[in-house]
Curated annotation (Swiss-Prot):
This is Transcription factor E. Gene3D superfamilies: Winged helix-like DNA-binding domain superfamily/Winged helix DNA-binding domain. Transcription factor that plays a role in the activation of archaeal genes transcribed by RNA polymerase. Facilitates transcription initiation by enhancing TATA-box recognition by TATA-box-binding protein (Tbp), and transcription factor B (Tfb) and RNA polymerase recruitment. Not absolutely required for transcription in vitro, but particularly important in cases where Tbp or Tfb function is not optimal. It dynamically alters the nucleic acid-binding properties of RNA polymerases by stabilizing the initiation complex and destabilizing elongation complexes. Monomer. Interaction with RNA polymerase subunits RpoF and RpoE is necessary for Tfe stimulatory transcription activity. Able to interact with Tbp and RNA polymerase in the absence of DNA promoter. Interacts both with the preinitiation and elongation complexes. Belongs to the TFE family. It holds the Pfam family TFIIE_alpha. It comes from the Archaea. The winged helix domain is involved in binding to DNA in the preinitiation complex. The keyword Protein transport does not apply. The gene is tfe. GO terms for molecular function: DNA binding. The lineage of its organism: Archaea, Methanobacteriati, Methanobacteriota, Stenosarchaea group, Methanomicrobia.
């Protein structure tokens, strides 16, 4: 069973490397699972452009989903990079991303706890209570009265999303 069989892991990796990069990952899993290979070998095996293979491998490496080892050729002195996927780490990385998202959503929920007002005439942009009070609840653009904006639905959606993410982390 491959780590890519997990829909969440597949989606996470796809988000990182895109469709073309995903093809590189799939070919590596299919053709050279658990083996060290050069980027040139991956390009040759997969039929994918060498620059795209390298870009994908570097992105995976930066996200701790691939590793490499360097070997120096004794005759030429050139360095050869041997790459290997390490997708076992993907679930851990996905959990870290979920924790970051929870923090971001909690900050957004805190912001949404403010009171907002909107202009009836202008394009509906929200104005914080403090600024609305400074302008005597009159739109600074067209001088029409500001109306209270009820963001209860947004706050509830944020709470639901945070709860869902926390439940998924608890599993």
């Amino acid at each position: 069973m491959s780590a890519l069989d997990n829909k969440a892991v597949r989606g996470y990796i796809q988000k990182l490397v895109g469709d073309e990069g995903m093809a590189v990952v799939e070919k590596m899993i299919e053709k050279v699972p658990d083996q060290e290979v050069t980027d040139e070998q991956v390009a040759q095996i997969s039929g994918i452009n060498l620059n795209l293979v390298r870009k994908t491998l570097y992105i995976l490496y930066e996200n701790h989903l691939a590793m490499y080892r360097r070997e120096r050729d004794k005759d030429s002195g050139w360095l050869t990079y041997l790459w290997k996927l390490d997708l076992d780490n993907s679930v851990h990385m996905l959990r870290n991303e979920a924790r970051k998202l929870i923090k971001k959503l909690e900050r957004r929920l805190e912001f949404e706890s403010n009171e907002f007002y909107i202009c009836q005439e202008e394009a509906p942009h929200r104005i914080l209570f403090d600024y609305a009070m400074e302008t005597n609840f009159v739109c600074p653009v067209d001088e029409t009265p500001l109306m209270h904006y009820d963001n209860t639905a947004e706050k509830q959606a944020l709470r639901n999303r945070i709860d869902d993410l926390k439940k998924s982390l608890a599993q």
